[in-house]
From Swiss-Prot:
GO terms for biological process: carbohydrate metabolic process. The keyword Aminoacyl-tRNA synthetase does not apply. It is found in: Virion membrane; Host apical cell membrane. The gene is NA. The active site is at residues 151, 402. This is Neuraminidase. It is an enzyme of class 3 (hydrolase). N-glycosylated. It catalyses: Hydrolysis of alpha-(2->3)-, alpha-(2->6)-, alpha-(2->8)- glycosidic linkages of terminal sialic acid residues in oligosaccharides, glycoproteins, glycolipids, colominic acid and synthetic substrates. Its main location: virion. The influenza A genome consist of 8 RNA segments. Genetic variation of hemagglutinin and/or neuraminidase genes results in the emergence of new influenza strains. The mechanism of variation can be the result of point mutations or the result of genetic reassortment between segments of two different strains. GO terms for cellular component: host cell plasma membrane; membrane; virion membrane. GO terms for molecular function: exo-alpha-sialidase activity; metal ion binding.
Length: 428
């Protein structure tokens, strides 16, 4: 075969290959066109379906050929029971306290991703209990954790996670931008209250089921703040206490009644010479009792109780077993502020049982260390320092911090009474 014949043979072979390639490309285009036509026809067809369908479509270019990938996932609907938490039962009688959970966040944070937090608290619906907390917008052992000691900064947010779990970015739910907060569940949805903004113009943002439903503007323009523990719900209405004014003098205090995330009523307390901060509130027999912090001049704790119409009573726990920190040694109490060592304070709580009271307090009189529960059978109204029960919760050698109350409703516990519970913040 001479060179010319070789060239002609090679050319013929190339031409045949090219024609075959062209036919294949035409067939590919026809196939894609037919596929799109079938998809478009199917999109106009409607069929009844009892399941939720989510279709994800990813469009990808490969070798200049349009490929359509369609994945269909079938999701069964999760029905969440809704029930009004009545709050009409009385507190369960108790003779002691048992440990419910501990998150060990500081220890886990030495290796894991754990938020820098303060002001944690617990609140329960009829289905679950969650830990709420104020982050500093940083993780433990991270460069952004330096200097996270401010109570109020634009980086602080209210978040929540299942109770007993260390608060991390992987299990936590954003609730609100906040440096002061509260949250509670009315049996239908979570209500969250997050306060943020400048000291002279802070705003409380109310969310119900994650949606902003109302706001409360600072009325004294002096660091509006709230409970740092759960609000209290009765018959579908939730109640909270807020403070606006000096932390070392007479301030203004208001009770708010909230329904489905909207303020329906508020009352300003007529409370001269009283100081209410960071109240711990709970329902009891259809009414609300709040035990608070006096940061001005009392080493015993002030209280306010009110009904669902916001008719209220005020006072101080009379017991000579003092509940604040710093505080003097136990002695003779008063139903007015006990002045020795009365300045400053720490968030705390108590549970009232008739004339008796369970008092939670630090074991130390001058530092936030240790924690104990004391039963004073006439301490709500009596001024002596006699008590009948004492139970250690945190050893004197360990740090404590804020503490507060929360409850489990009969709709959750199955009891015929409201179970009183407490939490303690281990500051490090």
């Amino acid at each position: 075969m001479n060179p010319n014949q070789k060239i002609m043979t090679i050319g013929s072979i190339c031409m045949v290959i090219g024609m075959i390639s062209l036919v294949l490309q035409i067939g590919n285009m026809i196939s894609i066109w037919a596929s799109h036509s079938i998809q478009k026809m199917n999109q106009h067809q409607t069929e009844p379906c009892n399941q939720s369908i989510i279709t994800y479509e990813n469009n990808t270019w490969v070798n200049q050929t349009y490929v359509n990938i369609s994945n269909t996932n079938f999701l069964t609907e999760k029905v969440v029971a809704s029930i009004a938490l009545s709050g009409n039962s009385s507190l369960c009688p108790i003779s002691g306290w048992a440990v419910y959970s501990k998150d060990n966040g500081i220890r886990i944070g030495s290796k894991g991703d754990v938020f820098v937090i303060r002001e944690p608290f617990i609140s329960c619906s009829h289905l679950e209990c969650r830990t709420f907390f104020l982050t500093q917008g940083s993780l433990l052992n991270d460069k952004h954790s330096n200097g996270t000691v401010k109570d109020r900064s634009p980086y602080r947010t209210l978040m929540s996670c299942p109770v007993g779990e260390a608060p991390s970015p992987y299990n936590s739910r954003f609730e609100s931008v906040a440096w002061s907060a509260s949250a509670c569940h009315d049996g239908t949805s979570w209500l969250t209250i997050g306060i943020s903004g400048p000291d002279n113009g802070a705003v409380a943002v109310l969310k119900y089921n994650g949606i902003i439903t109302d706001t409360i503007k600072s009325w004294r323009n002096s660091i509006l703040r709230t409970q740092e523990s759960e609000c209290a719900c009765v018959n579908g209405s939730c109640f909270t206490v807020m403070t606006d004014g000096p932390s070392n003098g007479q301030a203004s205090y208001k009770i708010f009644k909230i329904e489905k995330g909207k303020v329906v009523k508020s009352v300003e307390l007529n409370a001269p010479n009283y100081h209410y901060e960071e109240c711990s509130c709970y329902p009891d027999a259809g009414e609300i009792t709040c035990v608070c912090r006096d940061n001005w001049h009392g080493s015993n704790r002030p209280w306010v109780s009110f009904d669902q119409n916001l008719e209220y009573q005020i006072g101080y726990i009379c017991s000579g077993v003092f509940g604040d920190n710093p505080r003097p040694n136990d002695g003779t109490g008063s139903c007015d502020p006990v002045l020795p060592n009365g300045a400053y304070g720490v968030k705390g709580f108590s549970f009232k049982y008739g004339d008796g009271v369970w008092i939670g307090r630090t074991k130390s009189t001058n530092s936030r260390s240790g924690f104990e529960m004391i039963w004073d059978p006439n301490g709500w109204t009596g001024t002596d320092s006699n008590f009948s029960l004492k139970q250690d919760i945190v050893a004197m050698t360990d740090w404590s911090g804020y503490s507060g109350s929360f409850v489990q409703h009969p709709e959750m516990s199955g009891l015929d009474c409201i179970r009183p519970c407490l939490w303690v913040e281990p500051i490090r």
